[in-house]
Swiss-Prot record:
InterPro entries: Ribosomal_uS11, Ribosomal_uS11_bac-type, Ribosomal_uS11_CS, Ribosomal_uS11_sf. The gene is rpsK. This is Small ribosomal subunit protein uS11. It comes from the Bacteria. Located on the platform of the 30S subunit, it bridges several disparate RNA helices of the 16S rRNA. Forms part of the Shine-Dalgarno cleft in the 70S ribosome. It comes from Stenotrophomonas maltophilia (strain K279a). Keywords: Ribonucleoprotein, Ribosomal protein, RNA-binding, rRNA-binding.
């Protein structure tokens, strides 16, 4: 006897007017995630996922392309304004914020949430080239 076909629920697109853009800019890559106020992810993109490999991933242009990609995907949810939270010392910090502004979002505020140790772990030794 054949099993009946499983019914799939239609995914409901929720409407979110204001969101939060989390920009994680490391030295090697840039990750841009756009969430709602509760932290549920709406869209995300990375420099590596945007087609950049190797040392080109860590450029400001790669961060710009990744932020545009994540921003355009979040437009489907009706996001109009963004609060930007930047974490990390990477080269794509400013360019990601600029490109989110160019996509058409109203940037309400920009917060730097880079974790700063109170003299925690010992840093890695210096490179000798």
């Amino acid at each position: 006897m054949a099993k009946p076909a499983a019914k799939t629920k239609k995914k409901i697109k929720r409407v979110v007017t204001d969101g939060v853009a989390h920009v994680h800019a490391s030295f090697n890559n840039t990750i841009v995630t756009i969430t709602d106020r509760q932290g549920n992810a709406l869209s995300w993109a990375t420099s590596g996922g945007a087609g950049f490999r190797g040392s080109r991933k860590s450029t400001p242009f790669a961060a710009q392309v990744a932020a545009e990609k994540a921003g355009r995907a979040a437009l489907d949810y009706g996001v109009k304004s963004l609060e930007v939270r930047i974490k990390g010392p990477g080269p794509g910090r400013e360019s990601a914020v600029r490109s989110l502004n160019n996509v058409g979002y109203k940037i309400t505020n920009i917060i730097d949430v880079t974790p700063i140790p109170h003299n925690g772990c010992r840093p890695p030794k210096k490179r000798r080239v």
